[in-house]
């Protein structure tokens, strides 16, 4: 019986092994590993590391983390199994599910679904323990609302194509270049 190509190759490290190998070094660099996918079904096999940090993940950070991961993974015996290493950010479509996700998305606009069945679009402000401050439109102005994280059933960052309103950013405890007055 042929091996299942969806399962990691015996020569590739497991998800757990990759996390154990890289977690400490990523943390020292100021980043966390959100997920690792080891996929032997692709040709060549692929190891994808999803990382994030409080300052986000720009191209320089991705390059640095890729070099770091590559160097550490080179110490693992993968036999003759070639693989592609990919280091990436979680992406804008990742649901916000933890306090740190909300903290890292501060200043971004998000679509929120609440436990009472209502939904709203708001700019995310700071977190305070078990709640998040959000900025919502109120007529021609903006208001700050505090929402307990347990009341948020779904939250997804929205892509914006124009600069945010300066007042809205100020209320979200943000300053931003290019914000319109």
Swiss-Prot record:
Keyword annotations: Cytoplasm, Ribosome biogenesis
Gene Ontology annotations for the cellular component aspect, listed alphabetically: cytosol
InterPro entries in the record: Ribosome_maturation_RimP, RimP_C, RimP_C_sf, RimP_N, RimP_N_sf
Biological processes, Gene Ontology terms: ribosomal small subunit assembly; translation
NCBIfam families reported for this sequence: PRK00092.2-2
HAMAP family linked: RimP
Protein name: Ribosome maturation factor RimP
Annotated source species: Mycolicibacterium smegmatis (strain ATCC 700084 / mc(2)155)
């Amino acid at each position: 019986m042929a091996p299942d190509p969806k399962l990691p190759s015996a020569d590739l490290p497991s998800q757990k092994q990759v996390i154990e190998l890289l977690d400490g070094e990523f943390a020292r660099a100021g980043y966390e590993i959100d997920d690792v996918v080891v996929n032997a079904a692709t040709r060549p096999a692929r190891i994808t590391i999803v990382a994030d940090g409080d300052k986000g993940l720009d191209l320089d950070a991705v390059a640095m983390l890729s070099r770091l991961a590559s160097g550490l993974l080179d110490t693992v015996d993968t036999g003759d199994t070639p693989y592609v290493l990919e280091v990436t950010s979680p992406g804008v479509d990742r649901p916000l599910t933890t306090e740190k996700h909300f903290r890292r998305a501060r200043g971004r606009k998000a679509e929120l679904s609440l436990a009472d069945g209502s939904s709203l679009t708001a700019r995310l402000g700071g977190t305070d323990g078990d709640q998040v401050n959000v900025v919502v439109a109120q007529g021609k102005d903006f208001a700050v609302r505090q929402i307990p994280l347990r009341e948020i059933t779904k939250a997804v960052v929205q892509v914006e194509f124009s600069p945010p309103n300066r007042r809205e950013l100020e209320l979200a405890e943000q300053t931003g270049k290019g914000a319109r007055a």
